[in-house]
């Protein structure tokens, strides 16, 4: 079976994907590299070309090679060549289940969660319903038509795209001017609106190993440089602090780990996931679950693996075994 790292994509998170692919390429030097470009074409990519791309979070990657076809054609080739896809992809059709179902109908093994789980987790509104059934507390939603009343009631709101990642489109609602911004943004995509919750940002990974063990990784405490953990704070500002393990009390750490595990199971995730929380004065509050969290050198999940004493390459090898085993079932 030929191990192939698939990266890029047609959505806003393709820059992060390139950085994840660089980390995966370094850990899996014998893997082939396929770059999925914004026009849906797929390109075989040289290792040197990927690794010399020095500013992946800021500049678009250019494969510099001829296309092997559009994504569906590339997946047909992956099936005929007995390839296993290691997904260095994030967001959009790469994480919402569309790519996953295209692989499943062809019998192509791939890392990460399956299509059904990916689809549910990617929709923040639907995911909240699933995790709440499992006993995970999440903020109450605010209908767009009630946003003015909710702002008067709560004093501050948070609005974000219901199906997007890396905190793209995040709007803090403090005034009528912000309400106008939300309404304008909601014309092009569905927005999730919630009361602002004061507290410490936290995230907690969950890992499935090839021997069947499923457990939570050490929670991470996040202190954004500019007050919100958006794309810039995540990947561009060195002053953002990500403390792993987080400086939480033993009780709060245990609670975060339990809730992350519950969310992973409630959403039927596979392989690995990462769930984000706000630790309020009343305890951890669920925000969202990522089925393909970033795997860049600057990303949170690899930091949690390191804190757990797990080598990145061992994590990847386990995910490859899990992907192959799932396809054989």
Please state what every model-predicted region is:
Residues 174-258, 279, 284-285:
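Phosphate-binding site of ATP-dependent enzymes
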Residues 1-111, 115-116, 121-122, 126, ...:
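ATP-binding N-terminal substructure of ATP-dependent carboxylate-amine bond-forming enzymes
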Residues 1, 250-329:
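ATP-dependent carboxylate activation and anion-phosphoryl transfer catalytic cores
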Residues 109-110, 138, 157, 312:
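Hydrophobic beta-strand scaffold residues
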Residues 112-113, 167, 241-243, 297-301:
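Short small-residue beta-strand/loop micro-motif enriched in glycine and branched aliphatics
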Residues 26, 101, 129, 262, ...:
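Surface-exposed charge patches
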Residues 2-7, 75-80, 118-199, 210, ...:
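Active-site nucleotide/adenylate-binding loops and adjacent lid/helix of ATP-dependent enzymes
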